[in-house]
């Protein structure tokens, strides 16, 4: 058993087993597990949202700074670092939730593999304490009794698109996961005030006009906002339905959490962004 299995897969496996022992439905267990994960990550996610808010707030100042030092790239870089410090923004801090989510998603995939193709290994991954739960102990002894369906109608070990055809319920989950990813990205994306396309900026650069880095970044972010959901959709249709369900619930909760904070805690975010500016 690899270190990843010990550190990531086994805890996820046993948490799911514990939930399954209470509600013997794989889909419902994944939903409850995802809710637990999202709320455990909520403090980090909220900080990420604060970062996005501060980024938006500093955009006008950043634009002025870039115009001021347009002929001195070294001075511009130093000034930009000072500006990030002023607003207490860490360029990579906003990626923290995503980086934590990635091993969890891989862990869920491994757990689905175990339940779908290696049920004889259930005992190998189950903690002794968890195996003492009667439902779990019976499942370890009788692996074929595992209910891999969601609400009794959808096999979550299947793929949305396979050689056997299309599983429309799982395809719907893949679409919803991509949709919520898009909506969440739009919530935190910097406000774009330019209608220019990347090709327009590149064409201007060829003519000798210096590209506005903030403008380029905004254009690239806009492209990524559209590309990532499409990429996620194609990934989800190639993986077991349990992963599509996990990502749908996870992205859906993230969208609702962001919406709640942006609507009800706008004053709090403004205060935090302003306090970051004063530091």
Predicted regions: what they are:
Residues 1-279:
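Helix-loop-helix
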């Amino acid at each position: 058993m690899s270190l990843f299995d010990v550190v990531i897969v086994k805890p996820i496996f046993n948490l799911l087993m514990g939930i399954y022992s209470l509600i013997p439905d794989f889909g419902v267990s994944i939903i409850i597990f995802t809710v637990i994960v999202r709320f455990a990550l909520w403090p980090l996610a909220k900080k990420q949202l604060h970062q996005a808010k501060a980024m938006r707030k500093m955009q006008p100042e950043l634009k002025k700074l870039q115009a001021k030092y347009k002929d001195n790239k070294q001075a511009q870089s130093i000034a930009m670092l000072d500006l990030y410090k002023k607003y207490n923004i860490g360029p990579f801090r906003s990626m923290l939730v995503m980086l934590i989510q990635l091993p969890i998603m891989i862990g869920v995939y491994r757990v689905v593999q175990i339940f779908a193709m290696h049920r004889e290994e259930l005992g190998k991954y189950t903690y002794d304490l968890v195996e003492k739960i009667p439902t779990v102990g019976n499942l370890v002894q009788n692996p074929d009794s595992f209910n891999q369906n969601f609400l009794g109608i959808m096999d979550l070990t299947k793929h949305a698109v396979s050689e056997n055809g299309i599983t429309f319920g799982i395809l719907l989950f893949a679409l919803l996961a991509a949709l919520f990813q898009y909506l969440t990205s739009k919530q935190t994306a910097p406000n774009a005030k330019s209608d220019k396309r990347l090709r327009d900026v590149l064409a201007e650069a060829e003519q000798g006009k210096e590209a506005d880095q903030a403008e380029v970044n905004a254009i690239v972010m806009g492209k990524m906002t559209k590309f990532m959901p499409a990429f996620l959709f194609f990934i989800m249709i190639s993986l077991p339905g349990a992963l599509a369900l996990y990502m749908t619930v996870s992205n859906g909760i993230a969208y609702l959490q962001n919406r709640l904070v942006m609507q009800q805690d706008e004053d709090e975010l403004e205060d935090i962004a302003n306090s970051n500016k004063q530091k």
